[in-house]
């Protein structure tokens, strides 16, 4: 209903669904808990704000609005294995367990997270977490927060992500009429409301409880743990969590004074009630950088990829959004210092020469910005790199779906912008009849556009030009829709195979339970062999489907998130 009808209040959802208040409320609790629905209060005076609700005591309150978070839904359904593997490779298995627990439960307080992760590590003594395991969990949690892999769950005072990402809108022109000035004032007021909410959230988004930060620093200073070159960020004290203490009215019960009395996990200073969740934006940023490095390695070699990887890693903390078109400008000395810290043996002259070669390359993957106090500065054109990858992905899809001749026509139209049918047939060296069939197949699936330019008012075919062209933006959206459709089919097929495997296991258990005689043992043995073969076949099918789903998710991320 939220996908079809858009943002709705609780009362509107109850009326649309035909269900009672209690079932709708429980469903929203689960969806908000897992981040698939965002609950917030629209700005006063906003055009889409619902009317205030009057309570029985006569007071008037602003209603909450519920919206679907489609990107986070796709991340939770498709990208969970990739995220867990990334976390395990960079920070170890304990970090993987923490993120896995957060994905299972959506959002948790520190005390709840500790109670859920400790049993997975096999370290519980009478229902309590040992001190050594608690220290390890503290360290890993701080490392995750400093790496921005986890974040505080947004409150109801926080606008939705699609509003937070673009808080500043252009103001009205100076020569506007009185009416337009009034509209502009209202729009500015709404923008300021959303911007203030986003600013409050960004200030505390990765803020750790002061007690936890101090405890981990003490453990590192005492030499009880190996920090593995992790940089602990000193957070300024005195920052509050907003008027609502970091909790939304739709969240589950937060921490209390009695929760996790050991250490600072259960401290009653207000921080124990803050809930945490996985920050998919940071993982998407890492995957985006890895995709850029992969393309540079394929086109220009390992040394160029090493330099680009160092530039992206050094400027990552300065990026304000995931889809930045250019990286932060870095001088040759800055890039060289980053490479030295990562253990590279490249000299300063080699780094400078590699950057010059990248700047002179026709692909323009790196651009010269200018002179800085540290020398000549360069930046990585991430937008251009990813556009090139998207084009190659679309071309691969056209070739697989329509054949090599269709790919030849698609590339020709992309290079020449617009051509007539006869020109396409001549340049592509394809018969006219076959060219027409391929063009109309591509047109039917929205991979090309046909534009009619008439020289007369009667639009007679003999006096009309029919121009074929490729709109890369439209094709990219169409291809992404096809990928989402394929991903949905793979998920449904995977669920079907898993249910089939459960039925095979149930049948095998029933056959074992019915074994009651020596004569029947042979029959049961044959049945078990059949069930074993069916189960192995199901395992191979599930492995193939998971591999295909992983590849499909990589392509979806390229078009939807990068």
For the regions a language model picked out, list residue spans one by one.
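Eukaryote-specific detector of the first structured module of a protein
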Residues: 1-47, 63-65, 537-540, 544-550, ...
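Hydrophobic residues on short alpha-helical segments
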Residues: 1-2, 95-102, 304-311, 406-413
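Short acidic, hydrophobic short linear motifs in intrinsically disordered regions
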Residues: 4-17, 105-130, 307-308, 317-345, ...
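Helix-turn-helix DNA-binding helix
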Residues: 24, 28, 134-137, 348-351, ...
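Residues in the recognition helix of alpha-helical DNA-binding motifs
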Residues: 27, 140, 307, 354, ...
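A short, conserved structural fragment
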Residues: 32-45, 138, 142-158, 250, ...
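Short, amphipathic alpha-helical interaction segments positioned at domain boundaries
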Residues: 52-100, 158-243, 249-256, 260-295, ...
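Long low-complexity, intrinsically disordered regions
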Residues: 445, 489-562
């Amino acid at each position: 209903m939220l996908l079809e009808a858009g943002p709705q209040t609780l009362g509107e959802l109850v009326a649309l669904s035909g269900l009672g208040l209690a079932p709708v409320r429980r469903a929203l609790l689960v969806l908000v808990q897992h981040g698939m629905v965002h609950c917030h209060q629209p700005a006063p005076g906003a055009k889409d704000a619902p009317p205030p609700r009057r309570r029985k005591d006569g007071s008037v309150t602003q209603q909450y609005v519920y919206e679907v978070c489609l990107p986070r839904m796709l991340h939770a359904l498709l990208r969970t294995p990739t995220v867990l593997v990334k976390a395990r490779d960079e920070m170890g298995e304990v970090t993987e367990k923490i993120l896995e627990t957060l994905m299972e439960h959506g959002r948790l307080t520190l005390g709840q997270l500790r109670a859920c992760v400790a049993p997975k590590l096999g370290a519980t003594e009478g229902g309590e977490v040992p001190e050594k395991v608690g220290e390890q969990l503290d360290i890993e949690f701080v490392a995750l927060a400093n790496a921005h892999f986890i974040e505080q769950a947004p409150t109801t005072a926080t606008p939705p992500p699609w509003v937070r990402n673009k808080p500043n809108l252009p103001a009205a022109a100076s020569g506007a009429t009185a009416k337009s000035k009034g509209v502009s004032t209202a729009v500015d007021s709404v923008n300021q409301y959303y911007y203030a909410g986003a600013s409050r959230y960004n200030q505390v988004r990765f803020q750790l409880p002061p007690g936890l930060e101090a405890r981990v620093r003490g453990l590192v200073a005492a030499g009880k743990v190996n920090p593995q070159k992790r940089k602990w960020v000193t957070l300024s004290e005195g920052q509050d969590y907003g008027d609502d203490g970091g909790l939304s009215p739709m969240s589950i019960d937060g921490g209390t004074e009695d929760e996790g009395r050991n250490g600072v996990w259960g401290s009653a200073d207000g921080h124990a009630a803050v809930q945490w969740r996985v920050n998919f934006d940071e993982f998407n940023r890492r995957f985006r950088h890895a995709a850029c490095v992969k393309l540079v390695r394929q086109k220009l070699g390992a040394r160029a990829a090493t330099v680009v990887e160092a530039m992206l890693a050094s400027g990552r903390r300065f990026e304000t959004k995931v889809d930045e078109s250019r990286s932060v400008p870095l001088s040759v000395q800055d890039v060289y210092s980053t490479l030295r810290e990562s253990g590279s043996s490249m000299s300063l002259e080699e780094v400078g020469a590699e950057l010059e070669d990248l700047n002179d390359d026709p692909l323009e993957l790196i651009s010269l910005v200018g002179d800085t106090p540290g020398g000549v500065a360069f930046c990585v054109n991430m937008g251009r790199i990813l556009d090139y990858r998207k084009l190659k992905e679309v071309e691969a899809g056209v070739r697989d779906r329509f054949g090599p001749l269709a790919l030849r026509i698609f590339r020709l139209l992309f290079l020449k912008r617009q051509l007539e049918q006869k020109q396409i047939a001549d340049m592509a060296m394809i018969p006219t009849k076959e060219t027409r069939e391929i063009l109309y197949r591509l047109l039917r699936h929205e991979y090309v556009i046909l534009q009619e330019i008439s020289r007369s008012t009667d639009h007679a075919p003999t006096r009309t030009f029919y121009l074929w062209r490729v709109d890369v933006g439209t094709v990219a959206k169409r291809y992404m829709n096809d990928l989402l459709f394929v991903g949905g089919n793979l998920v449904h097929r995977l669920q079907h195979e898993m249910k089939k495997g459960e039925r095979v296991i149930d049948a095998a258990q029933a056959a074992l339970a019915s074994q009651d005689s020596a004569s029947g043992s042979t029959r049961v043995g044959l049945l078990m062999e059949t069930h074993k073969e069916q189960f192995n076949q199901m395992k191979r099918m599930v492995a193939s489907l998971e591999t295909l789903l992983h590849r499909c998710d990589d392509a979806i991320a390229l078009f939807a998130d990068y």
